[in-house]
Regions:
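Short, glycine/acidic-enriched loop or turn micro-motifs at the edges of active sites
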Residues: 49-50, 80, 170, 244
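Active-site metal-binding motif and surrounding structural segment of the metallo-beta-lactamase
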Residues: 52-100
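Binuclear metal-ion centers of metallo-dependent hydrolases, dominated by the metallo-beta-lactamase
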Residues: 233-270
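Active-site neighborhood of phospho(di)ester-bond hydrolases with catalytic His/Asp-centered motifs
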Residues: 45-47, 69-78, 100-104, 163-166, ...
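Metallo-beta-lactamase
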Residues: 12-13, 101-239, 244-246
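Conserved beta-strand hairpin/beta-sheet module of binuclear metal-dependent hydrolase folds
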Residues: 3-63, 154-157, 161-165
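Short, flexible loop segments at the rims of nucleotide/cofactor-binding pockets, characterized by
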Residues: 19-25, 76-78, 139-145, 213-217
Length: 270
């Protein structure tokens, strides 16, 4: 049984925030779009790939949101695993005023997912002062350049202290039993990640190290992103891949770990 069969329903992450993701069959990449519900309206963050579209939409309906009430689609960078379904989403939302929000730099590439007559729907978060407010709920956008695209950013919901971190804090793998992170007490001081002292097959710390070494371009970009994230008081980190971090101890641990991770991208090759 794969994970999408195990968790075939939306999962509440924080007040008004729902995981509406699925497991990409045939890969280990577990994609996590998130729906933020404010009164009877909603915002979708990193909406998912084309092949995820039907499953994501099913979960949005299960939350009780009519697609017509989605007012904004936020894309924290331009990769196909989060942007692939943008055209399908615009079609099904049938909202002529829907906004597709991203950075000026990422907009260049996101436009390639759309027909020309829809380019006007893409708006720059910079033009909103790096914030977006829906019925008094304000999301703040924090630039994390080159982590991993030039226009990458993360999104902070002050009301629930949730950080939507896109590829940051992601993993290629995930706990199969649960979408939430579950680090054992002895893991924080473990020095033999390649060979788990407890005999477990999956090491979530190693998985996160490997993901960032592969996906991020260099140490400087990753360390800078962590220095910006460290300034924020966060209760939950909701990444686009892997598991959701919800314990302060785990959040601090991984901010510090990724903030000094070596052999990242080109730095691990030269
Ligand atoms: Fe990406
Ligand atoms: Fe991704």
């Amino acid at each position: 049984m794969n994970n999408s069969e195990k968790i075939d329903f939306p999962v509440q992450v924080a007040e008004g925030i729902y995981w509406v993701g699925s497991h990409e069959q045939g890969t280990h990449l577990y994609c996590n779009p998130y729906l933020i519900v404010v009164d009877d309206k909603a915002i979708l963050i990193d909406g998912g790939s084309r092949s995820d579209f039907a499953r994501v939409m099913m979960k949005i309906l299960q939350v009780g949101i009519d697609p017509k009430d989605i007012v904004a689609l936020i894309y924290q960078h331009y990769d196909p695993d989060l942007c692939g379904s943008v055209s399908n989403l615009i079609d099904i939302c049938e909202n002529p005023d829907i906004k597709v929000l991203s950075t000026r730099d990422d907009k260049t590439f996101i436009s390639f997912y759309l027909q020309k007559n829809r380019f006007r729907l893409i708006e720059n978060i910079e033009d909103y002062g790096n914030t977006f407010t829906l019925n008094k709920r304000t999301l703040r956008f924090i630039p994390t350049p080159y982590a991993h695209t030039n226009g990458s950013f993360v999104t902070f919901d002050a009301q629930t202290k949730t950080l939507f971190s896109s590829d940051l804090f992601g993993s290629f793998s995930y706990y199969k039993e649960n979408i939430f992170f579950d680090l054992a007490p002895q893991c924080y001081t473990c020095t033999t990640l390649e060979k788990c002292p407890d005999g477990k097959e999956y090491c979530p710390i190693l998985a996160m190290d490997q993901f960032h070494r592969k996906i991020m371009p260099c140490e400087k970009a990753l360390h800078y992103a962590m220095s910006q994230i460290k300034k924020i008081e966060i209760d939950t980190i909701a990444p686009q891949h892997g598991n959701i971090l919800y314990r302060r101890k785990d959040i601090d641990f991984f901010i510090d770990r990724l903030g000094s991770l070596d052999k990242v991208g080109i730095d691990g090759m030269l």
